[in-house]
Design a protein with these regions (language model features):
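Lectin-like carbohydrate-binding module/patch detector with strong preference for beta-trefoil
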Residues: 1-104
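Residue-level detector of short, conserved catalytic/binding motifs and their immediate flanks
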Residues: 29, 56, 65, 238, ...
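A short, polar/proline- and glycine-enriched secondary-structure boundary/capping micro-motif
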Residues: 50-53, 135, 265-268, 350-353
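Short, contiguous pre-domain boundary segments
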Residues: 95-101, 115-122
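Non-heme Fe(II)/2-oxoglutarate
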Residues: 102, 305-307, 311-405
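Non-heme Fe(II) oxygenase catalytic core, chiefly the N-lobe of the double-stranded beta-helix
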Residues: 110-119, 128-302, 315-323, 332-344, ...
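Short hydrophobic-aromatic micro-motifs
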Residues: 123, 242, 306-308
Length: 405
């Protein structure tokens, strides 16, 4: 558990030389060859929505259908033809609609899903468009915006559309839904950019744990985990790390034990669990949590999204540089899991801001689906939100849960 023993295996991701293109309809949905032939728009990005730019138009990556293109009426937009037929707003023949050429993934989503299912983690290298990355860096006060200061987390979603756009990135959400085998997924806490500041050699470093909702190794009370350790056919959590800055070994990239996928167990106590490393004096007495040959670090360029099964053991990295390193850390859970933090207040603030008007209908709809938990029953559908009076009653009776993450 000392710095001298820090020798993880480094998985280094290179910036892609090319990305697939997405053709975004006015609704925000994507033009797809849904059955290998028929063109239509759809609300998710899988292999059917991938295109390759070529001279004079676009060719479908899977079925090879070719579209000709010309400049659209909107800035940076295109209008499309399949043969002599103009492509309408819903993807079929109709009055020509303006499509926007979007920033797609490096690899086919089906390839990424196969890797995710095989190993419990996958990286979408530079999946976010450069302008979205720039907006996230501005919110977090990192990289080129380090001297400008950061926007407080509770205000970020209502300040810049980049955070919402990163949160509703379609390929990572499709992968989460496929990996969990359900459509209704939610955020476990509100989105926000955080910065890992340079290490001072003294402060606590978060130790080994599994993420929400499992929390294996995280709670103060030994064994008081949200989900009991052990094998379970269902997947209750995926962690989504968005690299706002480049993630490197020296600037505090997350330390994993990627081989722990499928272990269904709490991290070893000797490695330095999170429920111990937060305690005052622990670092001075024991050094840093384990980082030896059984561990891994994923180095990735800014704009990369790393998805991993929440049961994979991991711990915080240590920033040994003199610069802040930015990230968006998100827990993705099934809709029936109670969130880790309330997401309704930030969503309400977002609704009351001018940011929704800067997003398309698909982006607004997806963000609402991710942030609003619901009761659906015989009486109808209700949004779930904290009740102040009942919360005070619980706290007054000493029944509030206490945990350190």
């Amino acid at each position: 558990m000392t710095e001298a023993g820090f020798s993880p295996k480094v998985h280094r991701l290179r910036r892609p030389k090319r990305h697939h293109a997405l053709l975004v309809a006015p609704s925000g949905e994507w033009l797809a060859a849904v059955d290998g032939q028929t063109l239509a728009t759809q609300a998710h990005v899988d292999d059917a929505a991938l295109w390759r730019a070529e001279a004079g138009g676009f060719r479908h990556v899977v079925c090879g259908v070719s579209l000709s293109s010309r400049a659209g009426r909107g800035a940076g937009s295109v209008r499309l033809n399949l043969g002599d037929a103009e492509i309408g707003a819903e993807g079929g023949p109709g009055p020509a609609a303006d499509f926007v050429v979007g920033h797609g993934p490096e690899k086919r989503p089906s390839e990424s899903l196969a890797a995710f299912r095989d190993t419990g983690w996958v990286a979408l290298t530079c999946i976010l468009a450069p302008e979205v990355v720039e907006g996230l860096q501005r919110l977090g006060g990192v990289d080129g915006h380090e001297g400008a200061g950061e926007i407080p987390r509770e205000r970020q979603l209502a300040t810049d559309p980049a955070l919402a756009r990163a949160t509703v990135e379609p390929v990572s959400l499709w992968l989460c839904r496929q990996y969990m085998r359900l459509a209704d997924i939610k955020l476990g806490h509100p989105p926000g950019v955080t910065a890992l500041t340079p290490d001072d050699g003294e402060r606590p470093v978060q130790g080994w744990h599994g993420d929400f909702p499992y929390m294996w190794g995280s709670d103060r009370s030994a064994g008081a985990y949200r989900v009991p350790p052990g094998a379970d056919e269902g997947v209750l959590g995926i962690q989504r790390n968005i690299c706002v800055s480049d993630f490197r070994l020296e600037n505090g990239a997350t330390v994993f034990c990627l081989a722990s996928h499928g272990a269904n167990a709490v991290p070893p106590a000797a490695w330095g669990r999170a429920n111990q490393t937060w305690k005052a004096g622990h670092r001075a007495e024991n050094g840093l949590p384990y980082g030896g040959e059984e561990t891994d670090v994923i180095e990735a360029p800014a704009g990369t999204i790393i998805l991993y099964d929440a049961r994979i053991w991991h711990r915080a990295g240590v920033n040994r540089t003199n610069r802040r390193r930015g990230a968006v850390i998100q827990a993705i859970t099934p809709g029936f899991i109670i969130p880790f933090y309330d997401t309704t207040a930030p969503f309400r603030s977002w609704l009351e801001s001018d940011v929704p008007a800067q997003l398309d209908e698909r982006e607004r709809r997806e963000l609402e689906e991710l942030m609003l938990h619901r009761i659906t029953g015989p009486q109808g559908v209700f949004a779930i939100a904290p009740d102040e009076a009942l919360t005070e009653r619980i706290r007054a009776r000493g029944k509030a849960a206490s945990a350190s993450y």
